[in-house]
Amino acid sequence: MIKKREAAMAGEIDGYGSDFLGQLVKVYRSADMTSRITIDDLIDECKNFYIAGHETTTSALTWIVLMLATHADWQEKVRNEILELFGQQNPSLEGISRLKTMSMVINESLRLYPPVVGLLREVKKGTKMGNLIIPEKMEVHVPSLALHHDPQIWGDDVHLFKPDRFAEGVAKATKNNISAFLPFGMGPRNCVGMNFAYNEIKITLSMILQRYRITLSPNYVHSPVLVLAICPQHGLQVTIKAV
């Protein structure tokens, strides 16, 4: 794939394409040795793009569908919002930004079942947090799942599906501790595909709920397991009927 991209762009002026792969190939072929990456780095990043762009979104959609299937009241609220904005037409980019109820449902599902359960970061400069000294180059694990399920932040109902906790935004939901909600990370190294993922999920849910009502199959066995991302060990069985 990399060789095909290089061959396709041969003869172009300063360009291997404007997508992620093109930018990586450009850095790989850079004349600046300080910024150049190796072929192994390039391949590793391509793997990251695949996992982050496919597995995590699939996982997120799976748990959102489960939450909607087991909470019919919220499913109806989201469906009514979709029909009010789009009717039976395809979702528009302008419209999906106004799906407030759906956004609440998505965020609450991501809180309960974040696709990525933890983040790894390397400390670039030694720092001190209270009495804790964190030296330079130490690898720090940020436990997203633990933060998402901390009752001191979210309250005693932390294990319940309550999308209305996000009714006034993440800051209000986390008691002004927005770093406690990390489905896509945070800061300069957060997920570059965050907005794309949100839009992809909203469009998919809109087109499903416009047409179908979802209920949980009695064959479903709840058993979340970590395989790249959190997913149902035995799959998700649902019943779908036309609205």
Regions found by a protein language model. Give the residues of each.
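Conserved cytochrome P450 catalytic core segment spanning the I/J/K helices
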Residues: 1-61, 94, 99, 165-168
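Cytochrome P450 heme-thiolate monooxygenase catalytic domain
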Residues: 1-29, 70-81, 101, 105, ...
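Central I-helix of cytochrome P450 enzymes
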Residues: 27-83, 109, 135-143, 182-183, ...
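Conserved cytochrome P450 K-helix E-x-x-R motif and the immediately C-terminal K′/meander segment
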Residues: 30, 89-130, 141
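Cytochrome P450 heme-thiolate "Cys pocket" and heme-binding signature region
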Residues: 47, 52, 90, 118, ...
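Cytochrome P450 heme-binding "Cys pocket" and the immediately downstream C-terminal segment
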Residues: 72-74, 140, 194-231
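Conserved cytochrome P450 K-helix/beta-meander segment immediately N-terminal to the heme-binding cysteine loop
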Residues: 142-172
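C-terminal helix/juxtamembrane-tail motif
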Residues: 145, 213, 229-243
